[in-house]
Amino acid sequence: MNRRDFIKSAAASAACASAGIAIPANLSAASEAEKGWRWDKAACRFCGTGCGIMVATKEGKIVAVKGDPEAPVNRGLNCIKGYFNAKIMYGEDRITHPLLRVNEKGEFDKKGKFKQVSWKQAFDVMEAQFRKTYDELGPHGVGVLGSGQYTIPEGYTAAKMMKAGFRSNSIDPNARHCMASAVVGFIQVFGIDEPSGCFDDIELTDTIVAWGANMAEMHPILWARVSDRKLSNPDRVKVVNLSTYSTRTSNLADIEIIFAPSADLAIWNYIAREIVYNHPEMIDEEFVKKHCIFTTGPADIGYGLRPDIKYKKYLSSELDTAATEKSKVLSEAEGVTLSYLGLKAGDTMENKNTATAGNHWHISFEEFKKALAPYTLEFTAKVAKGDPNEDIEEFKGKLKALADLYIEKNRKVVSFWTMGFNQHQRGTWVNEQAYMVHFLLGKQALPGSGAFSLTGQPSACGTAREVGTFVHRLPADMVVNNPKHREISEKIWKLPAGTLNGIPGSHYVKMMRDLEDGKVKFIWVQVNNPWQNTANANHWIKAAREMDNFIVVSDPYPGISAKVADLILPTAMIYEKWGAYGNAERRTQHWRQQVLPVGEAMPDIWQMLEFSKRFKLKDVWGEKKLNDKVTLPSVLDAAKAMGYSEEDTLFDVLFANEEAKSYPANDPIMENFDNTEVFGDKRGVIGSDGKEFKGYGFFVHKYLWEEYRKFGLGHGHDLADFDTYHRVRGLRWPVVDGKETQWRFNTKFDPYAKKAAPNDKFAFYGNKAAALPSGDLKGVTDKEKTPLTNKAKIFFRPYMDPCEMPSSEYPFWLCTGRVLEHWHSGTMTMRVPELYRAVPEALCYMHEQDAAKLGVLQNEIVWIESRRGKVKARVDLKGRNKPPVGLVYVPWFDENVFINKVTLDSTCPISKETDYKKCAVKIYKA
């Protein structure tokens, strides 16, 4: 029986059984094949949708995966990647043992070749290199590059190890690359992170607008729900796709708007202008007056490039773009949009607020209205039209139709976005603008209406953001530079007062730059591939390989980061360990370990706990110099007063304390399931001490979860207990009195909103930046701060050009991203034969007119070259992605088409998130 027949037979067999019909012989064969299978629920490994899956195991191996029909997110449906959750674990080149660069004597040698070593030797060398850097450069000389794919307990362990143990805030996730702009948008607008709505909005709305979000490929299960909603009432339900190139999402759209890179800023202001100037009666005045204030901030904020515009390691070709960090000559469009600052086209704007880019202040509605004045339909269409072949009048008609959909009375609207907004030199601004329009119309925090940021990774919300694995964060939206937040954290973690470091570490891109500068010399990479996923990659590869730096990569496969590393630690994959993820709608889901890791691979939690055994309090809690101005005080005497000994290890204090050991190993939830960290396992892995690892003897995952949830209880981030999540298909926080929350800030649904404003409809109860000075469009005029109790902010933000635009030498825009069949850098999905065969290489999607001008044919190889580097790729003129003239699209999943050698490491100056969506390139035949 082949695979297709088996699947058909299995489905028919199940149908017959449920109907009480006798099962035919061929169907019985399928049922027979399933004998001895154990099915258990889990979460999908891939995107931020958070699909539920069912995993079948037999004889210690995963034998099948299917969609979970009881999962409310996907209702039994999986995308193509979801069906291969098992196969990602069984690639032929899976790393099964620690690998260290050594010389002929077997000693560590940075110029040596990788050789299999024991866990003990791996940790011995790792410890020595860590101590060397820690002693030389202090807590911020060492760093961890973490992930939005960490399980929640993994991220919590990493944050606790670094911040409480090593007193270092230099831990940042790859979610910096995908969600930081959304996070800062939430914090600046609402005073608290994460969406107000939920996926139920899809079935309740009349209008779905995708902004820089190719949902058909990047969130295919959500797109299936969107498609179902559209088809349920095609005349009423409208779909709009706004993008810089045509995608599969356009296939369902009633309106497709192809706009010029960064022109989303202008389009949002055009919609707001239409509301304020031409349809003032549609402003929800009661909502705005009660629940919002108008704000703005500086425009001269730079582009997140190095402050040293003549940096010695820049290529000469990089200097022109680098110079924009200091100043920029304004374009014709910017002369119009920045006229409120007294500037005009041709003026040089000095970027004086690069260090204070996030500052903002209260302005009047009249000032807000004045700022919107330039964004007429004529001006916006001229700036925003992204397809040179499109008729300007047709484009204007689309913009007008888009505005009309938002403005229409009683029409519910959901705005979805992902990387097109977030990976943006003004990513924070454009996130804020989405809320601007929804607030003006009173279409936010309502069933079926709201601006909704979609996450790309499976736990960018649940781990990176909620746990606080960013350089500046602590759990539950707390931050390291707030003394009260440090005090709360120290109490929960049972640390001496003053242990936590109040100075944020280096964010993801800054950590790479610090590595190049010798300010960071030790980096531990977990659950991501930074040397493939970071823009302007040539710089960082040289820093890793050519300097006195030590790179540890925990990875199941030999991706680019593993190849540039000095030490590779073999890591257990998703169903080889216990875990939890938190998705884009605040839904938290847990799963059990289904099978043992392969070879000697071990879970990330085990790796961190074993590493923590090697450091005593006297090594890390004494006086530590951070920089020339700041020295962390010794807390050893205070630790002794708490009953600790300076000979105690970080493992003893942080992870194997009395509370941890109170969670017994005989918990019923573990019955008949493996738990490598708790019990060890039958592989008999020789651990970091040279002895067989036989487990910690207590339920470490449950301890980590129950301690972590203490941070959010009573603070609007309430999570359920560990056992509850193993009984349900996820819950959306805050979970209060056993009930999840669908719509935040709405007193009908959110108990925290009801508590904050019992007699009102809404309460925006976030408390970050909840008091502001006042001013006008040019700046602060009254420094006295006014409290903003239960209010959100409506920001004005201007249109500005990107810092690098096409020129005669580099005439094309380059945009990067993903494709349906592959995940991120492809280290997992490129090892699944079916996915590899479907899309074996990254292509350069190009318009036929551009190809004709270059003399390039379908499937020919071209060079794609920027000021920073070049790569070769095969041209596709007829594929799924259809760029306009002047733009090319190249996905980044293929290490053989290493497109991040070409991209620009410019970031949003507020969020520090990289803009992968726009830089200038030239293309020519290879």
From Swiss-Prot:
This is Periplasmic nitrate reductase. It is found in: Periplasm. It is an enzyme of class 1 (oxidoreductase). Predicted to be exported by the Tat system. The position of the signal peptide cleavage has not been experimentally proven. Catalytic subunit of the periplasmic nitrate reductase complex NapAB. Receives electrons from NapB and catalyzes the reduction of nitrate to nitrite. Mo-bis(molybdopterin guanine dinucleotide) binds at residues 81, 149, 174, 178, 211-218, 419, 423, 529, 554-555, 577, 604, 816-825, 900, 917. Its cofactor is [4Fe-4S] cluster; Mo-bis(molybdopterin guanine dinucleotide). One of its GO terms (cellular component) is periplasmic space. It catalyses: 2 Fe(II)-[cytochrome] + nitrate + 2 H(+) = 2 Fe(III)-[cytochrome] + nitrite + H2O. The keyword Nucleotide-binding does not apply. One of its GO terms (molecular function) is iron ion binding. It holds the Pfam family Molybdop_Fe4S4. Substrate binds at W892. InterPro entries: Asp_de-COase-like_dom_sf, CT_Nitrate-R-NapA-like, MoPterin_dinucl-bd_dom, Mopterin_OxRdtase, Mopterin_OxRdtase_4Fe-4S_dom, MopterinOxRdtase_cofactor_BS, Periplasm_NO3_reductase_lsu, Prok_molybdopt-oxidoreductase. Component of the periplasmic nitrate reductase NapAB complex composed of NapA and NapB.
